[in-house]
């Protein structure tokens, strides 16, 4: 670097979810009053980047998302996403040759235990995909499992807010067609997939999975209708147990196995910790289950030794953060709670490593039920400004 060059800090600001479209209709960004943004746009050079489909390692027609965006920006190259990896494995048939899964399923059959499939059930493609559930059910069928239970988490964020009926009807039809499986409970993702340490939400989902919910019905379609009657859209439908033919709840029991079907990790970690970890203390578990096998579609936590990832993590070498560190430069990652994993873990290529010279600051997100109650979140926090200035 020439000695005459000024050494000034550089800011990379990621406006998550911000996009460009010329049409005014239903375009909140274009219709908003943004004098500062518009001033920057009109004064300085700018360009567009594609943030979906094959441009970020996703299948054709698949929208991008926060994790994918941060991963590709941090990598500086196209990174094949887990959705595409899993789809390819199913298409090639390799998915159905997974020895650890097959051996676990054989053990369940020999011991008369049950398989429980958990996860977000939709075709949103951000955290999971319903096609992966169907592939896992096919494998369970091939292994001649008799006791297979599905605990779908309802979407309504990456899909329309009242679209759960079509997905659950489709699931029920598929279960009847293949001749195995029963829906044992449902839960809105607001409860089962919290990532902001709102543990009372996770506790409700945990109790439904392990003991049964005080809210119970005999038909999952009825459970959704009742949720709508309570003015709950899909993501907010309270954990509900679906009774069996003997009017009993179906729960995860000692010796049963679990496969968590989410391939995105951030919203799967908390409920996994509650189900699996011996030293868990975020809330008092009224019932601790000894799960025989706990599979996750991808790795949720590299330090977790009690679960097994079906698809191992792929490494992204020489990411932006790693490169900056190798140059001996300093870097600061700052975000509030909701996006902290994205500017750290995902931006570093799915790597938990904190590089030399890398500082991290987490600004707490506001404690509100939903962020439409405080849409600015913590953007006006003095901590953002003071920490940036101090670095």
Whereabouts are the PLM-identified features?
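Short helix/loop capping segments that flank catalytic or ligand/cofactor-binding pockets
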Residues: 22-23, 82-83, 194, 250, ...
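Conserved ATP-utilizing enzyme core subdomain
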Residues: 330-382
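Active-site pocket-lining segments that scaffold enzyme catalytic pockets across diverse folds
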Residues: 250-270, 276, 287-291, 299-302, ...
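Long, well-ordered, tryptophan-enriched scaffold segments
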Residues: 109, 159-253, 266-288
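Short, hydrophobic/glycine-enriched beta-strand segments
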Residues: 9-15, 258-262
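Conserved small/polar residues in nucleotide/adenosyl-binding loops
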Residues: 383-390
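Short, basic/glycine-rich phosphate-binding loops at helix/coil junctions
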Residues: 16, 77-86, 356-369
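Active-site nucleophile/metal-coordination loop of metallo-enzymes that catalyze phosphate/sulfate
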Residues: 2-10, 19-190, 200, 204, ...
